[in-house]
Regions:
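N-terminal lobe/hinge region of extracytoplasmic solute-binding protein
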Residues: 52-105, 197, 521-522
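Surface-exposed binding/hinge segments that line
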Residues: 103-107, 146-186
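Gly/Pro-rich hinge or "lid" segments in bacterial periplasmic/extracellular proteins
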Residues: 71, 93, 176-226, 230, ...
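Ligand/substrate-recognition segments at binding pockets and active sites
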Residues: 361-434, 505
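Aromatic- and charge-enriched surface segment that lines or borders ligand/interaction sites
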Residues: 100-142, 296
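Detector for C-terminal structural segments
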Residues: 309-339, 388-397, 419-533
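Append "and occasionally in soluble cytosolic enzymes with long acidic Gly/Pro-rich linkers
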Residues: 297-397, 486
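Extracellular/periplasmic solute-recognition and catalytic clefts
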Residues: 145, 153-155, 205-214, 232-291
Length: 533
């Protein structure tokens, strides 16, 4: 009996003027920079929108909008250029998007029907053959996607796509909803500067990495009227500069605003759209024997003391101004697979006792413990494009100093290069959406396993590998949750990963901006609903 794992699309098309596939091409880019939208809206001319974002840059592995490169699928989907077959609802469930339905025929075969109305922004129909070409290129060039999807073959027949996987893959449709799953027109190709043609409400016309992206309205959009004519995405990595740009009217909305800047926008001139997310601030321990600090990081007492010595609640209350909540494991407790895990709580006195018992003693009175002539120094690697991460580093530096550790912070945009050098760091601390796909598998597959592309610390656990193998082929949702809880506990019992807090994500805009809504998966930002009133 066939298992329907995605909801059949039964709703009618949205009411509105829909441009059909094959209609006239989109307008070319206008010359010069876009001005703020509010002035254009007031004058009755074309509507423009300027969006400030501190994550759209090469150091964040988002140099372009090509979803087949690194993590560039994020700006592709966020800025309304690309769309995926299914969409992640705020409760973590799947909803149809480009696909009308997805049916799990058997453990390794899926049938996906593409909506007949979908077309690319160049007017070309998005049929199953176009999706096939896109996915085949994706798994050819994108290592992480190929490992996640486990696609053995793809067949196209009209609007029906048949995917056969090399092994049972219960969450294939979740993975195809990841940002790298944006469907792009491979006949159109990918430009040298990373511009692609998608199915979304906006069309990219100019991209300068680490600076800006220009977009225009997709006049062929298949899913409703697009209200904004032109969009400029500005990469603004400095928190103060981002705040001043919004306050002065240089931009119309901002993503990634520092929490310390929120009070200046808590008035009638601005509005917030916020939601609890699974974006987690967390640290990974370096287990490499090549690490000159191996004697420190391979000591279970040191790892336990670090977990005991980080004040999670203080970080949330003081440095995040309450815009977050403490973490125990990798996932929020709102998910079934985030419940019931146990981790060390902040207890500096117990941390001191653990270190003392393990032979880490301050013999020279400088406040830093040592053992066998080795000072207890922790090299903390993080990055500035998530404005909260440097604050977490400073908080941990202060509280770990109290228990006798010298935390040396390397806060650099080059962290993704440095983390690949096992001699250069002891703890790598980042911020990631751990349950953005509504399922736990992606976090473990990306960060925790022997073949994970971002297991930079070289963590290994026989038990974790066994559990991951079971998770990969388990279709029952409750059993998947049980396995994920056990996998988290394996990480926490060894203190090889420390999960500090989850983020309440907000976008801030001028009060006259509508249709800019925050979502729990953190994928969807600019949509056809975006408007200036």
């Amino acid at each position: 009996m066939k298992k329907i794992l995605a909801i059949l699309m039964v709703l009618c098309l949205s009411v509105g003027i829909l441009a059909g596939c094959g209609s006239s091409a989109n307008a070319p880019a206008s010359s010069g920079e876009n001005s703020s939208a509010s002035s254009d809206a007031a004058s009755g001319t074309k509507k423009t929108f300027v969006f400030g974002d501190n994550t759209f840059n090469a150091s964040n592995e988002e140099p372009t909008i090509n979803p087949h490169e690194a993590y560039s699928g994020w700006p592709c989907i966020r800025y309304g250029v690309g769309e995926t077959l299914m969409k992640i609802a705020d409760d973590g469930t799947l909803e149809p998007w480009l696909a009308e339905s997805a049916t799990n025929v058997n453990e390794t075969t899926w049938e996906i029907v593409i909506k007949d109305s979908v077309c690319f922004s160049n007017g070309r129909k998005c049929d199953a053959a176009a999706v096939k070409a896109c996915l085949e290129h994706l798994i050819e060039v994108h290592e992480r996607a190929a490992d996640n999807l486990k696609i053995a073959s793809i067949e196209a027949d009209g609007q029906k796509l048949t995917i056969v996987t090399s092994q049972p893959n219960p969450v294939l449709m979740n993975y195809l909803s990841e940002a790298y799953g944006c469907i792009i027109d491979m006949d159109e190709g990918i430009t040298d500067d990373g511009i692609v043609v998608g199915t979304g409400p906006f069309v990219a016309t100019e991209l300068v990495t680490d600076d800006h992206l220009n977009l225009v309205k997709n006049t062929n959009y298949w899913d409703g009227e697009v209200h904004i004519d032109e969009v400029t995405i500005r990469n603004i990595t400095d928190g103060d500069t981002l705040a001043l740009a919004l306050q002065s009217g240089e931009i119309d909305a901002a993503y990634g605003m520092a929490y310390g800047s929120y009070p200046m926008f808590e008035n009638d001139s601005f509005k917030f759209s916020g939601i609890q997310t699974s974006r987690c601030f967390w640290g990974m321990v370096n287990f490499s024997t090549e690490n000159p600090s191996a004697a420190i990081m391979l000591d279970p007492a040191v790892r336990k003391a670090i977990a005991l010595g980080i004040n999670k609640q203080g970080f949330v209350d003081v440095l995040l101004n309450g815009y977050g909540y403490t973490a125990t494991g990798a996932f929020p407790e709102t998910f079934a697979f985030g419940q019931g895990v146990k981790a060390e709580s902040y207890d500096p006195e117990q941390a001191k006792a653990v270190l003392q018992e393990a032979g880490w003693v301050d013999t020279d009175g400088d406040g830093i413990r040592e053992k066998d002539g080795v000072k207890l120094v922790i090299r903390w690697l993080t990055y500035p494009t998530r404005l909260e991460l440097p604050l977490l580093a400073e908080s941990a530096q202060a509280t770990l100093r109290e228990i006798g550790m010298d935390v040396q912070i390397n806060n650099t945009k080059d962290h993704n290069t440095i983390r690949k050098d096992p001699t250069a760091w002891d703890i790598w601390v980042s911020a990631n959406v751990n349950a953005g796909l509504g399922d736990p598998a992606n976090f473990f597959a990306t960060y925790c396993l022997d073949n994970s592309v971002k297991n930079s610390g070289g963590h290994h656990s026989d038990r974790l590998e066994q559990l991951a193998d079971q998770l990969d082929v388990t279709f029952d949702v409750n059993e998947r949750a049980r396995l994920a809880i056990e996998m988290q506990q394996e990480l926490l019992d060894d203190n090889s990963y420390v999960f500090v807090s989850f983020l309440r994500m907000s976008m801030i805009s001028k009060a006259n901006v509508t249709g800019l809504e925050a979502h729990a998966c953190d994928f969807y930002e600019l949509t056809a609903d975006l408007d200036i009133k």
